[in-house]
Amino acid sequence: MIVTDKFVFVHFPRTGGTFITDVIMKFFPAAQEIGYHLPRYLLPKEYSHLPVLGAVRNPWEFYVSWYYHVWPRDAATPLTSWLTENGTQQFKGATRNALNLGTDNDRLDALIEKLPDEVDYRMRNIPNITKDSLQKIRGTGVGYYTFRFNHLFGNADEVSFCRQERLRADLIHFLERIGAASDEIRAHILESEKKNTADHSHYSSYYTPELAELVSIRDRAVIERFGYTFEPASTAHNANMNP
């Protein structure tokens, strides 16, 4: 999470947040990171009056980007080792595990056992979900994406979102709306390179029909909120480098 004198940014992983962070740190001198992937409910009261910015991504695309970002880089971390069953599961199996997080109590218990009781959000590359936080997914039937969305943002009606597929335009629109845009910021946003990308083919090529349908079930609330759909590669640009 980054706080400025104009707004607060809550960073949802794999949604273009590194790009947004770079813009904020470059153009807002008062900006400071107060916790890496810090949930909004932990926002200090002195910043509670500020507008909150977040970012979202098509859930089908999120799981592909997330998998190819954390594996094999974070193969030994608690979440990744749990997702991949110690490296024995590849994308389909790992994603199925993530989607069934709120329905498979035995596997949920195994993951909770690996997580800390408390999180020091000043640290990076550590488990940033507590045992108590993850307990809340039990019996909900939602997938990992929806769990993280709810955990980070809480009441999403109180948050302005940049959609990853139109990140630059949405970011400029938000900054204009709060009176924090300038010609220099607009030019920088439009001309800067992507950040923290994961190398993969179009997301649809990784899914079986059954797995794609499971995403639509487990992450239905977010999908319907933002109007996301599953697009085959033939109807979308084959982007090999997505943030």
Enumerate the predicted regions with their spans.
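Membrane-interface amphipathic segments in extracytoplasmic regions
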Residues: 1-243
